[in-house]
């Protein structure tokens, strides 16, 4: 059995009341911020405050019988290629690290939020998405937890 539950298993746990979005989000944040894990190379930004607020809101809605989508309450990350309002989108490049923060979310981010997904942070990527291998000399190259090549299944 896989030590890391699948998104399907986590969604089933939420639906059955075995776990809350707040519990899942705290577990995701803990793992992302663990200095012994890959979190420092995987995440370019962790937005714990916003994630905790979204998880609490999701749990409140679920308790009222409102489930917006199958993603309701599930912690997710967003590649540093997509704008998140109030955050700098670097696209994996140091050239953009001092760019002004995004004024609005990318449409895909709006859709995730509308679906009830909990965005815990932004993830590393190849500079300007120019490689399928996930290599990034500026922010580090994260390892794929399933021993495959980063950026795709090879």
Model regions and ranges:
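An N-terminal boundary/leader segment
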Residues: 1-53, 60-63
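Alpha-helical scaffold segments in soluble metabolic enzymes
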Residues: 9, 27, 57, 107, ...
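Residue-level detector of short coil/turn "hinge" positions at structural boundaries
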Residues: 20-21, 68, 119
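Short coil/turn segments at secondary-structure boundaries
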Residues: 26-27, 45, 70-72, 144
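Short, solvent-exposed polar/charged micro-motifs at secondary-structure junctions
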Residues: 52-55, 131
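Immediate post-signal peptide segment of exported/extracytoplasmic ligand-binding proteins
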Residues: 58-75
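Short glycine/serine-rich loop/turn segments
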Residues: 71-154
